[in-house]
């Protein structure tokens, strides 16, 4: 056996599969032969320069032989996941070339190095690029690097050299993304975890410089992908922290905020749908748009609010800051409709309880129907995307006295539409309905005699489950009526939530010997709500008393009358009285 046969034997013994790309031109196509053994070795083996096999390959193999697919040994070694710079240098010293030869995909060895290398070595990069005068014949190198490495750390030496040696910044992949699209993805994906590590990350200096550089080298700032996204769309869609400096860099170099993607959304619309959106960047975008293209009309503002409520499920002050800003900037009133719905209808229809709760708090009427005469309950039950409808209905019921009695009564005819997996919330809903509506249980008893009524429960929650819940609630209500609280009873206090009785309710809530299985949660909610309201009323009265002088007509009112008047104010109005424009900071 000669040494070439020995190379084939050693490589063949270690390989169980030959990829199509490595098939040779000989009779043994699909197998390892003298024609492709060097390529297989350099592509898949952990090349050890001290090994016997490596020395045989160097001695007997043609280091520049190309397969019919175009792969040279240099192509193969640059795609080796165990690539070692010292090995490459030895191969080059032994005559390996083909720096600019292309495989059947149009890739030169540098493509594979950029794609497969875990970390780009500047010296190796120079070795692979210096023999090439310019990259005009391999114009997608910059796109290749960014496409495969955008979610990790980028080498800016590599970026700038690719850019300045002729790599086309307007090359696109099969989805229409350019280098700038991928770079915008990189800024979001990689810098989220590094944002506060240093001032350079916070100020995004390197990122801004490269954005300016790539545009100066001809990148189209408004290039659109196959789904219509510009680089600004792409950046603002990412679910990570955004930098106002990056946004400004894109805007100042000509990013058009009017361009709509295939979903008919501008970059501003895409941003407002993002849970990670912040008020200061939104203000920057809107101000820039209006300075460049004119003032946004009322209907455009309503549409932005609609998109925000429908898609943005962010929680906390950041989300509410945007909501308040949009309501104020576009002067949107509580009873104002967009298409057929108010903002509150949109919130409940799209399960955005964070927004809905705030809108109810500031005075939006939960009982107001849509223009086509639908209640918020109707919107929930008509939305097929809401699987667990009882969860959302419970969020509405949670507003208790703000929900009118006719609305409560309407739920009787929707009980059969609850899912059998919703029984936790169904119990809460039915318990409150029976508390508020004395006819609820009577109506159920009456309908029980009708077999058609029972049959409507066949598809979803069972009739027996509903019947059992109503029976338990009725039993607890009888007990609630027996508990005396001053001049009334516990049942009436829970129905009216009169804060005069909050101390009595607190005593009942803290007494572990008293329990109402179907109403314990409601008692706790009412206790906390009444306690909070009582404290607000006390603070408001103290502030009012400190500002009323003896000449004021209010000073003649008896304290109990004054307290009764203040008690009728909502939490929103009390907080506004106490804290003025800063009232939103005290939103519960």
UniProtKB/Swiss-Prot annotation:
<feature type="repeat" description="ANK 2">
    <location>
        <begin position="175"/>
        <end position="223"/>
    </location>
</feature>
<dbReference type="InterPro" id="IPR018272">
    <property type="entry name" value="PRANC_domain"/>
</dbReference>
<protein>
    <recommendedName>
        <fullName>Ankyrin repeat protein OPG003</fullName>
    </recommendedName>
</protein>
<dbReference type="Pfam" id="PF00023">
    <property type="entry name" value="Ank"/>
</dbReference>
<comment type="function">
    <text>May be involved in virus-host protein interaction through the ankyrin repeats and PRANC regions.</text>
</comment>
<comment type="similarity">
    <text>Belongs to the orthopoxvirus OPG003 family.</text>
</comment>
<dbReference type="Pfam" id="PF09372">
    <property type="entry name" value="PRANC"/>
</dbReference>
<feature type="repeat" description="ANK 5">
    <location>
        <begin position="339"/>
        <end position="368"/>
    </location>
</feature>
<dbReference type="InterPro" id="IPR002110">
    <property type="entry name" value="Ankyrin_rpt"/>
</dbReference>
<keyword id="KW-0040">ANK repeat</keyword>
<feature type="region of interest" description="PRANC/F-box-like">
    <location>
        <begin position="557"/>
        <end position="574"/>
    </location>
</feature>
<feature type="repeat" description="ANK 3">
    <location>
        <begin position="227"/>
        <end position="259"/>
    </location>
</feature>
<keyword id="KW-0677">Repeat</keyword>
<feature type="repeat" description="ANK 1">
    <location>
        <begin position="69"/>
        <end position="101"/>
    </location>
</feature>
<feature type="repeat" description="ANK 4">
    <location>
        <begin position="300"/>
        <end position="336"/>
    </location>
</feature>
<dbReference type="Pfam" id="PF12796">
    <property type="entry name" value="Ank_2"/>
</dbReference>
<dbReference type="InterPro" id="IPR036770">
    <property type="entry name" value="Ankyrin_rpt-contain_sf"/>
</dbReference>
